[in-house]
Structures are given as C-alpha cells and as structure tokens.
Design a protein with these regions (language model features):
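Cytosolic, long alpha-helical scaffolding segments
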Residues: 1-316
Length: 316
C-alpha cells in the first residue's frame, strides 16, 4: 500500500537522507539485484524503491523478499505504482554501536566454535552459509549505523564520544572471521574424511582452540582497551601466526607410516590458512583496542584524540 510505504518508520539519523532508487533492466541477474540492495541499505537510506523495466519480475520480487528477511528489524515491503518499496529498515529502538558490535562478536565466536575440527557437525555447506548470513546481516547493520552517525545530526552524549569508524573496522574484521569459520568447517569436514591419526587431530584441535581464544580475548580488549594488554595480545598474535606456518609439516608428520592422501594435504592447507586469517583479523581488533587506549590517554596538547589508525591491511 503506497500510503503505508510513504509513512514508514526511520531511524532519526536517516531522516535527512534521501530514499534510494534502484532501477533495473528487465533481465537483471538476481546477484546484481542483491548487490544493489546491499549498497542501498549500507547508504543509510530510510527507504529503497526498486523499479524494473517492463514491471517487477517474479525473480526480482523473490530477491527483494529474501533481502528483507536477511536484514530483519521489522523491515516492510509493499507494492507502489508498479515498484517495490522496502522501508522501516531500522529497529524502533536501535542498539548502540558498541552493543551491536559485541553482539556480532558473540555470533562470530559461536560460529567459529561450532566450526572446530572436533566439534563441527556434518551440516551441509548451505547450512554453514546460512549461519554466515546472520553474521553478514549484523555487520551490515553496524555499517549502516556508522553511516547514519556520520551523515545525520551529531547527537552523541559524552559517554558516546568515540569515533564510529572504529566499530566499523571491528565489524569488518569480525565479518571476515565469520567467512573463514565457514571455510574451516567445510574443509575440516573433508580433512576428517581422510581418517587422521589421533596426534594429528589433537594438534589441529589445539590450534583451533588457540585461535578461538585469541579472538575472544581481542573482543574483551575492545570493550576495555589497555595499552599494555593490547601490545601483549599483538605479540601473541605474531607468535600464533608463526605457529600456523610450521604446523602443516608437524601435522603431516603424524602420519609417519603412510604418505598422506592429497585430500588430507589440501584440506589441512585450507584449514590452517583460514585459522591464520582468523588470528590476523583478531590482531586487527587488538590494534583497534590499542588505538582506543592511546586516544584515551591525557595529552599535553589538548583533549584526547578521536582519530583512528587503520589495522592490518590486505587481509583476504
């Protein structure tokens, strides 16, 4: 109903942002439509209008409906003069950026824990992707809220006076950890099919626990940043990554009596690569905590700085 779509609900900081029009060709691929929807959502627009030449196709409607379900938050979808209108894109009582980022962190830790070599279920790859979709949606929400914070009126209280880009950086690191957790689960299942010996299983499980604990510790630091603790965490991250580089040979040496099958070598390589990336992204979070702690230090040149340096660059 056009009247409902016209009214709608919006986050206070979205009201100064114009509705976003997505104009599609008649044969627009579903993947392209989905990317356009994500970009529109991240722009912090309060309303997305989808127009398609020749009228909305059934596959386009399905993509928009699926996207609405992904973002949740009570988002509504209506028809309006032949177009699709997606609105009410924000919760009525949105959480703060810190709360939202830590909720994302909890989801990522759950996913990473479930993906462990000894704990991963025999779920299909599609099931793991579905879990990762939840992580992606939370990361999108953080980015949307950061955009609202920058484009909307500055209404921060004293306790909120923090550079929101830090939460965006942390959420992106967490999103990538979630991606690698899925890869660990998928390739770990293939590795288990090669019937690894107990010593091999134990070594890989121990390193997975270390990577999981590292990310957990980085999130604790993000909530309570301290210079000394953050530096210690970064040193530990370097040591863990060095361990990952030597672990393949140690793991395969456990199969001393037989040459490991190619599937074992490839699967182990992928699992260890992803565990290395998990630690690297955890280091990014520790660096964000370190920057926050440094910014909070009293300065003889004025009030604490809200500038933020970037984390490790070039991660996959």
């Amino acid at each position: 109903m056009a009247s409902e779509a016209t009214r709608g609900r919006s986050h206070p900081r979205s009201r100064s942002i114009s509705p976003r029009l997505i104009s599609l060709e008649s044969d627009a691929p579903a993947e392209h439509t989905f990317r356009e929807l994500v970009a529109a959502y991240l722009s912090a627009t309060p309303k997305v209008i989808v127009h398609q030449q020749g009228g909305i196709r059934s596959n386009t409607r399905a993509v928009v409906s699926s996207f609405r379900e992904r973002i949740g938050a009570g988002a509504r979808l209506d028809d309006a003069q032949g177009d699709l209108v997606l609105y009410d894109l924000d919760p009525e009582s949105p959480s703060g950026l810190a709360h939202l980022t830590f909720r994302l962190g909890e989801r990522v830790l759950e996913l990473l824990r479930a993906a462990g070599p000894e704990t991963a279920s025999t779920a299909r790859e599609e099931d793991w992707d579905e879990r990762d979709n939840i992580v992606d949606a939370l990361a999108w929400e953080v980015q949307r809220r950061v955009t609202q914070a920058w484009l909307g009126p500055r209404v921060y209280g004293r306790h909120e006076r923090v550079n929101p880009i830090r939460w965006l950086e942390a959420s992106r690191a967490l999103e990538r950890i979630g991606d690698h957790a899925v890869l660990i689960a998928i390739h770990g299942a293939r590795w288990r099919e090669t019937e690894p010996v107990e010593a091999e299983r134990r070594l890989l499980t121990e390193f997975h626990h270390q990577a999981l604990d590292y990310v957990d510790g980085a999130l604790v630091l993000l909530g309570d940043p301290r210079v000394g603790s953050a530096n210690a965490a970064l040193d530990l991250g370097v040591a863990l990554r060095e361990t990952a580089r030597t672990l393949v040979d140690r793991l395969l040496a456990a199969r001393s009596r037989n040459s490991p099958p190619p599937l074992a070598v490839v699967s182990l390589g992928w699992v260890l690569h992803s565990l290395d990336r998990v630690v690297a992204y955890g280091m990014d979070i520790a660096e964000i905590a370190l920057d926050s702690a440094r910014s909070a230090r009293p300065s003889s040149h004025g009030p604490p700085s809200e500038d933020n340096k970037g984390g490790n660059e070039g991660h996959e």
